[in-house]
């Protein structure tokens, strides 16, 4: 039964990966076409372009790894498996930092706080986006190198077999590996939660101001608040189980876990990127309009 459930999870992950690849290819092509036509690109579209390329490569690598894992009859090469893990970890970390940067940009541009820090960020964040994107890549490279260093210093735990189940002896090296992975993702989580909280607070202030002035509170600024807030909240809903599942998959003793746990981790790890990419298309006016035109043309 568990074997069938695991096989179903693999099929579901392959389908979701195909969806994610198509969605991110669409995001990349639309933004690239706009960039070539107008010879300029907005800060948010520049981030989306980088995010689309990164996720396209990441999901493609994940799909190749899944197909190779299922179709391979012989034992997998340790070096090839390590290559897949490290490339995926780097691309995954880069894409998460790109999303974090996108949420920061939305928060700074849409909120109407008059604090000097926010006013300074409003003026300076857009010209700094290329450098911030490079910083995201460098942070991801550093995180991946840190993972390599700690995993080399952390030997695989020895299996301790009992009559009922199999347990693992977790040593201090593995605990340091877990701590490094948690710390690398906790900063992203804190920034994203803070951005969403500031957006919600700004939206509440905006609605109160509109009500006090006896005017309709649903205007373009309110719509921008709500759209960005929805994207951030849905991102967090997808991101939290995804980060837990991915953390478990990176641990050395993941290979010894039962198929039920592996299946759940696989589904949560695969659902995030395609789901968030679809949300980006739905909430982005230009991408949404282009997608509607393509669907209407096909009909």
From Swiss-Prot:
Specify the protein's topology with respect to the membrane.
Multi-pass membrane protein
Which of UniProt's keywords are assigned here?
Cell membrane, Cell projection, Cilium, G-protein coupled receptor, Glycoprotein, Membrane, Receptor, Sensory transduction, Taste, Transducer, Transmembrane, Transmembrane helix
Question: Where can this protein be found?
Answer: Membrane; Cell projection, Cilium membrane
Broad class of where this protein is predominantly found: membrane
Q: Which residues lie on this side of the membrane: Cytoplasmic?
A: 31-46, 103-131, 194-230, 284-299
Among InterPro entries, the record links this protein to: TAS2R, TAS2R4
Report the protein name in the record. Taste receptor type 2 member 4
Look up and give the organism this protein is from.
Pan troglodytes
């Amino acid at each position: 039964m568990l074997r069938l459930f695991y096989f179903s999870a693999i099929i579901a992950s392959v389908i979701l990966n195909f969806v994610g690849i198509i969605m991110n290819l669409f995001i990349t092509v639309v933004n690239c076409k706009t960039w070539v036509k107008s010879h300029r690109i907005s800060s948010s579209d520049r981030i989306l372009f980088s995010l689309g390329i990164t996720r396209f490569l990441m999901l493609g690598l994940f799909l190749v790894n899944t197909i190779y894992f299922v179709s391979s009859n012989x034992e997998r090469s340790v070096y090839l498996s390590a290559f897949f893990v490290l490339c995926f970890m780097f691309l995954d970390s880069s894409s998460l930092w790109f999303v974090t940067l996108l949420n920061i940009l939305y928060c700074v541009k849409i909120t109407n706080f008059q604090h000097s820090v926010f006013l300074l960020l409003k003026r300076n964040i857009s010209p700094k986006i290329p450098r911030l994107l490079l910083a995201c890549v460098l942070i991801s490279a550093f995180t991946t190198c840190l993972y390599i260093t700690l995993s080399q210093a952390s030997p695989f735990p020895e299996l301790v077999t009992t009559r009922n189940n199999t347990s693992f002896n977790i040593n201090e090296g593995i605990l340091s590996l877990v701590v490094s992975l948690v710390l690398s993702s906790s900063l992203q989580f804190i920034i994203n939660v803070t951005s969403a909280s500031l957006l919600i607070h700004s939206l509440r202030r905006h609605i109160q101001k509109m009500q006090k002035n006896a005017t309709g509170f649903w205007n373009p600024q309110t719509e921008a608040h709500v759209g960005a807030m929805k994207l951030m909240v849905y991102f967090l809903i997808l991101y939290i189980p995804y980060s837990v599942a991915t953390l478990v998959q990176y641990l050395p003793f993941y290979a010894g876990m039962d198929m039920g746990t592996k299946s759940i981790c696989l589904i949560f790890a695969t659902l995030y990127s395609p789901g968030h990419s679809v949300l980006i298309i739905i909430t982005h006016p230009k991408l949404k309009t282009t997608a509607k035109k393509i669907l209407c043309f096909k009909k």
